[in-house]
């Protein structure tokens, strides 16, 4: 801003606008600071004859115009003197904090680095932490990225510097993080579009993208622009992401890029998010309606019914982000808009969203031509561009939405610790009846016959004794099963102590489930004690207040209408 001839008072006004944001409560201060740094503000000049000046703290368009500094052991005086291992500054603003531990020392772990940032530093030096939007923890062999509010289990490695690179691991992961997330042109992109604070968060959430989300959103944006109508074919492309890898957040990041990053191409677009189940519609809506500030769009909501959809979308001139189910589109819907700056993003694009062609349906009354929901959707928005997100890319998906633009496989997701690999491992808990026990059983039945019991009744009882439920519920088998489950679970937890391991035991009926529960509780009585954490002493009062008290193991069962 050298050409603006700012006065000393105006420079101080710009600095104070940041400094005077309260640091307590820390989450509110951090979010407000981030929004100010991200969006800038309009400053009224001291000379009222001059036009108000829009001030940006970071030049996101030209990263080279910014001043980047990395400072180690920076001393900060708060309630206590603290020295974070590393701070990353952009134009004097400490936007990232890094804490390092060594993998050699057994008494310190990467989890200790997380605790140091999220507990000690947030408690003792909040005036610094309100500026720290990114948080990095490392033990040399593992390096992970999150925010200062991110739970430890949601810190993840940035395993690729560039999308086509091989996945890094071990010591190289730190260098990959630096190159992939903290290069000048990368860190500015991450801060600008890939950090999300919900408008109204009751859980102090600050979402930082993972590397597959960062690459996927940008590649999908480029492909959508290339295939947009009227010059393109309207096939915005397919994103193949493993189940549980965060596709909904990828859709949110993509929506921001569409809404804000190329006005010449999109010209205030309308974005329609399409689900195929009500529960997914609700889940997606709950996220998107808290992202109005992030999307720079006040009209973000779920479409309630067909009437609401027609009133909202018919001849809408521009803008808006809407979440709806594809089943709301039918033959009667007809044309809603022929604009070309409508972007339809289909979730679970392999299921109900590929039926654009005619099918013959034979009934008792004759043969009829039917169409899928996707055909009616395209009748409603004939010039829209369509892109699909799926965990199961089938040929029809690619034919309708276009080529797979980017993918993140289950193996990659599992290797990165984002999803848990499901593997079948047969473990037999056999129940063997000894010869002596068999003789005792036969002796009992012989006695029953001698005393006048009906032979048919005896045979029926034998069949009942050998039925599956009886075998499964044999006390010895239940005991062996419980012991094997506990041993197996604890062994897996010991292999990867940094990951929260979960287990589900499926039983034939509720009675068997109850017996298994009691058998496991007999082996590990402490598992039935309700707690908020394995070690509550490591958490602050505020953190404990946000957690629900639960036992480590519990019984979950359904109940039918005829059950007592």
Residue ranges and their predicted role:
Residues 510-557:
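Conserved helicase motor "Helicase C" RecA-like lobe of SF1/SF2 P-loop NTPases
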Residues 137-138, 322-324, 344-345, 385-390:
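Structural recognition of the conserved hydrophobic beta-strand(s) that form the central parallel beta-sheet
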Residues 304-322, 335-339, 548, 560-564:
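Conserved motor-coupling elements within RecA-like helicase/translocase cores
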Residues 168, 398-500, 516-522, 529-532:
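Interdomain helical connector at the RecA1-RecA2 junction of SF1/SF2 helicase-like NTPases
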Residues 318-376:
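Conserved RecA-like ASCE ATPase "motif II neighborhood" in helicase/translocase motors
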Residues 74, 278, 300-310, 325-331, ...:
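Conserved helicase motor
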Residues 242-243, 350, 370-397:
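Conserved helicase ATPase motor motifs in RecA-like P-loop NTPase domains
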Residues 1-270, 275, 279-295, 317-321, ...:
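ATP-dependent helicase/translocase motor core
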